């Protein structure tokens, strides 16, 4: 099953899974992962000030289930949301339209070939993205390319080796259904990758199997 088809089949339940708002998705989140995705999302989004006034890329923007309320407050920002899935984009667009958010532009695209010039964005957000990107090294390179020197890269993604039940479920279910795409980083591998790009300007911590990070691009490329 391809990644596109997997997410198409999941669309009706995606937001329920991510937010744990149904009894079964609450059990999935709190018993299997032992992590509250809502709390993780809040922590990541708090890294971005409401009065941020620069250019921002959100990749993958997904359905905007976590970001819509935040973006409603960020009226001075110029936000671009990119996702490979047109179904995700349709849901996000409907959500932004209902919230009367006009300063977010949505585009279908591939994180490994971002349709933007180098040093274009002041901030890049990537929540729950890198564990679904097939070519993770290229994705990191593209994010680094389009980010301005001094710009911020923040977000979260799954890392292996922190919780056995979660790792088993990823290998046996999510990877096989195309909902996650291996290979996956360990915490050490993820930290090494971020530091290879951003040097000492890296802050990370993990909430069990979820890595939360904030990086600042050095003023001079390396």
What are these regions (language model features)?
Residues 20, 28-29, 34, 154-213:
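C-terminal alpha-helical "lid/dimerization" subdomain adjacent to the S-adenosyl-L-methionine
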Residues 55-113:
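Class I SAM-dependent methyltransferase SAM/SAH-binding core
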Residues 137-149:
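A short glycine-rich, Lys/Arg-flanked "PGG" loop and its adjoining helix->strand segment in the class I
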Residues 213-222:
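C-terminal lobe and adjacent flexible extensions of AdoMet/dcAdoMet transferase-like proteins
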